[in-house]
Swiss-Prot record:
Belongs to the SMIM19 family. GO terms for cellular component: membrane. It is a single-pass membrane protein. The keyword Transmembrane helix applies. Keywords: Membrane, Transmembrane, Transmembrane helix. Its main location: membrane. InterPro entries: SMIM19. The keyword Ubl conjugation does not apply. It comes from the Eukaryota. PANTHER family: SMALL INTEGRAL MEMBRANE PROTEIN 19. The chain crosses the membrane at residues 25-43. Pfam families: UPF0697. This is Small integral membrane protein 19.
Length: 101
């Protein structure tokens, strides 16, 4: 098994470079896992701060559009109420005329 997969050197000694590389890789993975857990815990505690960073403040155009649509709804509601009162007024006039006759 001379020189097979870098485990044994030609002189019969064990090559530890694979083990060292494995140890370094696992250390890196452990650090990444610990940092990600820490970031996850921080994110859970400070969710609102983080979301405030990513939310876009409303522009002036959207505010005016919303006001425009609110105004249109109010105008339409006012028109409907006026039509309702006019209809009720005519119904009352008809009922009064019937009772008088």
């Amino acid at each position: 098994m001379a020189g097979g997969y870098g485990v044994m050197a030609d002189d019969g000694t064990i090559d530890y470079s694979v083990h060292e590389a494995w140890n370094e890789a696992t250390n890196v993975y452990l650090i990444v896992i610990l940092v990600s857990i820490g970031l996850f815990m921080y994110a859970r505690k400070n969710k609102r701060k983080i979301m405030r960073i990513f939310t876009v403040p409303p522009t002036a155009e959207s505010a005016t559009e919303a006001n425009f649509y609110d105004d249109m709804k109010k105008i339409r509601l006012r028109q409907q109420l006026e039509m309702y009162y006019i209809a009720r007024k005519h119904e009352q006039n008809d009922s009064i005329q019937l009772t008088v006759e």
